[in-house]
UniProtKB/Swiss-Prot annotation:
Protein's gene: pyrF
Organism (species): Wigglesworthia glossinidia brevipalpis
Pfam families given in the database record: OMPdecase (PF00215)
Protein name: Orotidine 5'-phosphate decarboxylase
Catalytic-site annotation from UniProt: K62
This protein's UniProt keywords: Decarboxylase, Lyase, Pyrimidine biosynthesis
Record has Phosphoprotein as a keyword: no
Length: 232
């Protein structure tokens, strides 16, 4: 069955609120993303609960460490049946290769993707890190490393999705946060796009958090978004 292109970011600190939200939507509408704060506060209890209720889980921990540590961590996480997990592409070739190698020992391994440049960043942020190039060039560079390491795909902003898709083909997964609707608050996001243009640009999965989790009727909102996406 083809998965929904929507990943909802569970931007909660309290697992009870995440559970309450999950009961308002359906697993066929989206996958769910769990980040650092919620994972620390809930552990695998929440993941198990959501999986038992039919949801696929993207564990967004953006792992970044020495290769041996990453290999052991990915191996341990994969045993919990998560759908997708990520590492930082900036961790380097050896780290990403170690992460990929860990999954060779797992039946039905999760998708392994690499974070390129955070959607909260702009060119001046790269310059402060002594990276003097355009964001798109750095995203392509990091994506190329992930591709060579055999990862399933990358995370980038929708601004870079079209060029990443063109360079790495249709089998390379592109996950794009920074999804916002017209006339909504960008919060801490800088490189943003509406969900429909993001999919047109080549994204496989769009990550939407607050616009959906703070909606008075998230089920209906998801249905409206999916209906429009199905016509693209």
């Amino acid at each position: 069955m083809k998965l929904s292109p929507i990943i909802v970011a569970l931007d909660y600190s309290n697992p009870k609120k995440a559970i309450s939200f999950s009961k308002k939507i359906s697993p066929d509408q989206c996958q769910l993303k769990i980040g650092h704060e919620l994972f620390i506060n809930s552990g695998f209890f929440l993941i198990n609960f959501l999986q038992k209720n039919g949801f696929k889980i993207f564990l967004d921990l953006k792992l970044y460490d020495i290769p041996n540590t990453i290999k052991k961590t990915i191996f341990s996480l994969a045993k919990f049946g998560i759908w997708m997990v990520n590492v930082h592409a900036s961790g380097g070739y050896n780290m990403m290769t170690a992460a990929k190698d860990a999954l060779s020992h797992i039946n039905n391994p999760p998708k392994l993707i690499a974070v390129t440049v955070l959607t909260s960043m702009e060119k001046s942020d790269l310059s402060k890190s002594k990276i003097f190039t355009k964001i798109i060039n750095h995203v392509i560079h990091l994506s190329n490393n992930a591709y060579k390491c055999g990862l399933d795909g990358i995370v980038c902003s929708p601004w870079e999705a079209e060029k990443v898709r063109k360079k790495f083909g249709n089998n390379f997964i592109i996950v794009t946060p920074g999804i916002r609707f017209k006339n909504t608050n960008y919060n801490d996001q800088k490189r943003v796009m509406n969900p429909y243009d993001a999919i047109k640009s080549g994204s496989n999965y769009i990550v939407i958090g607050r616009p959906i989790t703070k909606s008075s009727n998230p089920y209906l909102l998801l249905e409206k978004i999916l209906s429009k996406l199905n016509n693209i």
